[in-house]
From Swiss-Prot:
It comes from Mycosarcoma maydis. It is found in: Membrane. Voltage-gated chloride channel. Residues 815-835, 858-928, 1061-1131 are annotated as: Disordered. This is Probable chloride channel protein UM03490-D.
Length: 1131
């Protein structure tokens, strides 16, 4: 239902919104209806939702349904008006009856004849059809842009990562892989070596080329004849030599084939052969290191120590540039973004978080953050970037701008596309958005997520950024089956994944708490220190030195036919590999804990997968070593002798799945993502076993993944999907003294004073100060809009009486006046006001008819929807006394996020402006307001929502929590016997959840320590929730304080040294050596004397502080005097 914004209780009638669409039936209200639409358009320009407020989904859905209903009415108006023949008499006047709505009149140059009208009708149909396909077109466009963006980010990341180790001499823009493309196969670095025949071919190329050169030495310009290779003795060598000859001929351009010197032939032939030899023997010499076989790739230094220093310098430089850009231009670009996007999809508004600058800076700095070597990933930030693209693109389309529900669907689809291109898993991306991101996931959202993920994946596939046909670098395929005896080892990997997730989440939150307390002003320095420390620690370990995606590709690979890397598949080096992998697991876990959450784009998905992969590969190597040592054990009876029994790469693959599931607590999406990475149906069951065990172990320690825990840590108003058992009524958590407005009348100055309070987004409306009967709810922005319009229409002062008329007898009850004449005068306008409500659904019609029946009664006391009447006088008297005591104690206690008014539910735009900008916005808004003709009164009743969501005080809190989850309101009013008792918001429920969790944690701690349970009774008060620190936070705090103390001791010496150097540089001119020597001697003696006095002052009692300060001031004055004397000597 829609309360008309222009219902006047005096003589004027409120226009019906249908008058704008049915002029033939409501011509009396045509001008008023145009004013209604003007108000709607003006309010569309106002940003409806304030930053860090919550979207009311009940409001938004109602407004969207009514908007669609008005469009259908406008489209059907043509068929209503075209039944008459009026347009035949006056063609120009008939344009108003065509029924395309406002703005439907064609331009002046359009033909006014019959064919012109038909063409205009066809054009309207085309526009309607195109608008129907606009949504899908926007989804596809967003998906294409996401794919392009991720392709560019992948290439930039690879190039910047390789820049720390060297550069390509043939092109500075090429990374190591593209620079040495000829030296490796399609598998990339560490790929499979060439077969033995190719090695023989390369050797023959070198030999035959040498023979050709010797034969051609006699004649410097001798032609190269095809008969030369035929001189080889045997058929096998002849075939090899023939192929070598063909390679040599192809290496020589056609125009130089008959005029080449012997030296040129020898160089070309030897070059081709040596390249083939290098490629054939690449695996034996550590194919992962292309610098030994690729001459185009130049390392910064051939020595380990200088290369290590340069590696750290590049890491610090890249991290500094990244952190500085984020801090200077887009602070919202820091972090992963998953937690905030979950809250945004649930209705929490963060203005600028999905803006253009965030998109540009995060896309630019994400490759820098990954290339710096920080233990962070790009998959989480890829979701944030994808949502930024969706938001920026949708801002150009009005259909998305004015509907928060459609914008939510688009952002959900964008997040699915972001995961799809990050992991090369379109179906996994859709399931990720369903399982992790979406707060509400209807069927239409599923289709749009699928379409967007498909468009993004196809675009990335066309780009082919790695030139291998892979969407991501660590895609791999397995063709071997697993054995049932391996399930015990899979269980071990699953347990590790659960322990890893619980461990990382617990200690990362402690690091975040320490970072918030001590490192807020040192974000850039922290990032540089972390990057340098990571490079310092990880350079010696090859699994930490290389990029994490490349590390995953190497660890996932099979040994047989998959290539080797640093002897990873060699049996003689298995124990060295075990040690290296274990060290990499431990060190990267520690680095992830301290790095995730720093002020750069930072994800945790791929770092967790890299940790799980190193642990899993280690387990696989140990199992394979056990099989090689005891192949005849009954445990290995299922193994076939001629087929490799154990594949360590599959263990790495399962370890990555376990770690990812442990830190995110996602199950189905992880299984599908890992399946799409391998394409192996045989490993779905092991993956499900591992992920299921990981989920159980991790949830035993704590519930919720890293994203949910970060939401709680940040204090965002987000209700998770878990069920809670409170066992209390809603009255125990409601706000009992909310700010209210009085329908009996308020002075304009008093009303504006309440509007100036930034703690509220709206106010409940009660009958009067002495009667707390609830009449409705009104939003702050609507009131400011109406007052601003009224000020432009006529003069208003602070004593103007503001009225909120809802029913025909409401004001009479409030004033104690029962005037039948006045009531009769008001009755007709109120009936028409109610009749003008749009009827877009059967429920709306039923409520409207109920209101009509209530208002039409001659003796009935009017009541707003949702209010009950008190029949017993005793109960009424008691409730009136309670309401007087309630309303008399109104005050402002804390921030309260309330819903916008009913007017905004139906007609307004999608965003609220900030409270600081509201006055300026209202000043420029258009539209009208009720009661403009009365100089003493200002009627604002048309802006009231007469049907807010209400509950009884005794309703269980669990039911109210389900209402918040399923309906999505911002505020629910608590009403008893028709009178306002309080209100409850999402924050109230979250406070209760936090108190309950804290109490349960305190109880577990007390039980583990053997303390009595009464010691944790105060936990239920909720005080200090989340304020406690952990052991890691305490350790970091002690280290920080120790560093501050040491710096306080060192910094004065550094300052003195700097001052001496500065004075030496000033006194270095000829003729000033004497004065400089005298100054230095005097200053050193003075500093020694005052240093001794400072040492004595440190041992003085507290009452000597003033004396110490005077001593220091004297010292400072003496330094100034000495410097001044030196300046005089210099002059």
């Amino acid at each position: 239902m829609n309360a008309s914004p222009h219902s006047k209780p005096s003589a004027a009638l409120a226009p019906s919104p249908t008058a704008a669409f049915f002029p033939s039936t409501s011509r009396v209200y045509t001008s008023k209806a145009a004013t209604v639409v003007d108000d709607d358009e003006a309010l569309d320009e106002i940003r409806r939702y304030e930053s860090f407020s919550t979207v009311d989904w009940v409001v938004d859905n109602t407004r969207e349904r009514n908007r669609l209903a008005r469009e259908r009415q406008a489209a059907s108006a043509h068929f209503v008006s075209s039944s008459s023949n009026a347009h035949l008499g006056n063609a120009d006047a008939a344009w108003g009856h065509i029924g395309f709505g406002r703005g439907g009149v064609p331009p002046r140059w359009w033909s006014r004849g019959p064919w012109g009208r038909r063409a205009w009708l066809v054009w309207g149909i085309v526009k309607s059809a195109s608008s129907a396909f606009t949504d899908s077109g926007v989804i596809v466009l967003v998906g294409i842009l996401i794919g392009l963006n991720m392709g560019v980010i992948s290439l930039a990341t690879e190039w910047a990562s390789d820049l720390k180790q060297g550069y390509c001499s043939s092109g500075w823009w090429l990374n190591q892989k593209f620079c040495c493309w000829e030296m490796m196969d399609q598998a990339g670095p560490g790929g499979a070596p060439l077969p033995a025949a190719a090695k023989a071919l390369a050797t023959a190329t070198v030999t035959v080329t040498a023979s050709i050169g010797a034969a051609a030495a006699a004649t410097d310009s001798a032609p190269i004849l095809p008969a030369t290779p035929a001189a080889t003795p045997t058929a096998a060598i002849r075939a090899v030599a023939q192929e070598a000859y063909n390679l040599t001929i192809r290496a020589i351009p056609d125009h130089q084939l008959w005029s080449r010197s012997a030296q040129d032939v020898i160089q070309d032939g030897f070059g081709t052969g040596l390249r083939l030899l290098s490629r054939a023997e690449g695996a034996a010499s550590g194919a992962g290191d292309l610098s030994e076989t690729c001459t185009d790739w130049v390392r910064w230094s051939k020595w380990s120590f200088p290369a290590w220093i340069i590696y750290m310098l590049f890491a610090g430089l890249l991290s500094f540039i990244c952190a500085h850009l984020v801090k200077s231009f887009a602070p919202y670009a820091a972090g992963s973004g998953i937690s905030e996007i979950k809250c945004i999809l649930a209705g929490f508004v963060i203005n600028g978080y999905l803006g253009f600058w965030t998109l540009a800076i995060k896309s630019l700095t994400l490759p820098l953050a990954i290339a710096s070597g920080l233990s962070v990933g790009k998959e989480g930030p890829a979701v944030h970037v994808a949502c930024c693209i969706g938001n920026v693109v949708a801002s150009f389309f009005r259909s998305f701008n004015r509907s928060q529900a459609k914008m939510r669907e688009l952002l959900t689809a964008s997040s699915a596309a972001g995961v799809a291109v990050a992991f090369g898993s379109p179906i996994g991306g859709v399931l990720f958005s369903l399982e992790e991101m979406a707060y509400n996931f209807p069927a239409s959202t599923m289709w749009r997520s699928f379409l967007c993920a498909l468009a993004a994946t196809v675009t990335l596939s066309f780009m082919n950024p790695f030139r291998t046909g892979k969407l991501v670098l660590f895609q791999v395929s397995y063709d071997r089956d697993w054995h049932y005896f391996e399930i015990m080892f899979y269980i071990l990997i699953g347990i590790f994944g659960g322990l890893y997730g619980a461990f990382v989440i617990k200690y990362n939150l402690q690091v975040q708490s320490f970072r918030r307390s001590y490192l807020v002003k040192h974000g850039v320095s922290e990032v540089v220190v972390l990057a340098t420390l990571t490079a310092f620690v990880g350079y010696a370990n090859k699994f930490l030195r290389i990029d994490m995606t490349e590390s995953l590709e190497i660890l996932f690979r099979e040994c047989e036919g998959g290539g080797d890397y640093d002897n990873l598949c060699q049996s003689w080096a298995q124990w060295r590999m075990v040690n290296s992998l274990l060290l990499a697991t431990v060190l990267r876990t520690a680095l992830v804990i301290v790095s995730y959450g720093c002020k750069v784009p930072a994800g945790i998905f791929v770092p967790s997968m890299a940790i799980g992969a190193t642990f899993g590969r280690m387990v696989g190597i140990l199992v394979k070593a056990l099989y090689n040592a005891f192949p005849h054990w009954s445990l290995f009876s299922a193994c076939q002798p001629d087929v490799p029994c154990i594949t360590p790469g599959t263990y790495a693959f399962l370890g990555a799945a376990a770690a990812l599931a442990g830190v995110t607590r996602i199950t189905v999406a992880v299984v599908v993502i890992m399946f799409e990475l391998t394409g192996a149906l045989t490993y779905i069951l092991p993956t499900m076993i591992v992920v299921g065990i990981t989920k159980g172990v991790a949830d035993w320690f704590s519930r919720g993944g890293i994203a949910e825990q970060m939401i709680k840590f940040s204090g965002y108003p987000f209700l998770d999907k878990d069920d809670h058992n409170f066992g209390i009524p809603v009255a125990d958590v409601m706000r009992v003294c909310p700010q209210v407005l009085f329908a009996s009348g308020m002075k304009l100055s008093e009303l504006e004073g309440k509007l100036a309070d930034g703690s509220y987004k709206g106010f409940p409306l009660v009958l009067a100060k002495h009667d707390a009967t609830l009449l409705g709810y009104v939003g702050k922005v609507e009131l400011r809009y109406a007052i601003g319009k009224a000020r432009r229409a006529r003069a208003l002062d602070g004593d103007t009486l503001c009225l909120f008329s809802v029913g025909p007898n409401a004001l009479d009850r409030a004033d104690g006046v029962e005037s039948s004449a006045h009531g009769a005068q008001q009755q007709q306008p109120d009936l028409l006001s109610v009749a003008s409500l749009p009827t877009t659904a059967a429920a709306d019609r039923a409520v409207r008819e109920d209101m009509l029946s209530r208002f039409s009664g001659a003796t009935g006391a009017g009541s707003a929807s949702g209010l009950g009447s008190t029949s017993a006088t005793g109960v009424a008297s008691q409730r009136r006394h309670e309401s007087e005591s309630l309303i008399g104690q109104l005050d402002v206690e804390d921030d309260r996020s309330s819903a916008p008014s009913y007017r905004s539910r139906v007609d307004a735009g999608d965003n609220m402006s900030s409270s600081s900008d509201d006055d300026a916005v209202v000043g420029n808004a258009g539209g009208g307001v009720d009661g403009e003709s009365d100089l003493d009164k200002l009627e604002l009743g048309g802006w009231i929502d007469p049907t807010p969501l209400i509950v009884q005080p005794g309703m269980p809190l669990e039911t109210v929590m389900d209402m918040f989850k399923n309906l999505g309101p911002r505020v629910i009013l608590v009403v008893e016997y028709g009178r306002l008792s309080g209100l409850v918001t999402v924050k109230d429920v979250l406070k209760r959840i936090a108190m309950q969790e804290k109490a349960e944690a305190a109880a577990r701690t007390a039980a583990a320590a053997g303390l009595p349970m009464s010691g944790s009774a105060n936990s239920f008060t909720g005080e200090g929730a989340g304020a406690g620190g952990g052991e890691l936070e305490a350790l970091l705090k002690e280290a920080y304080e120790w560093a501050q103390e040491k710096w306080a001791l060192i910094s004065p010496r550094i300052e003195r040294i700097s001052a001496r150097r500065a004075s030496a540089s000033r006194g270095g001119a000829p003729g000033s050596q004497a004065g400089q020597a005298r100054y230095s001697h005097l200053r050193e003696s003075t500093e020694d004397r005052y240093d001794d006095s400072d040492a004595v002052a440190e041992d003085m009692p507290m009452h000597s502080t003033r004396q110490t300060s005077a001593t220091k001031n004297t010292r400072s004055e003496h330094h100034q005097f000495v410097l001044g004397a030196q300046d005089d000597d210099d002059e």
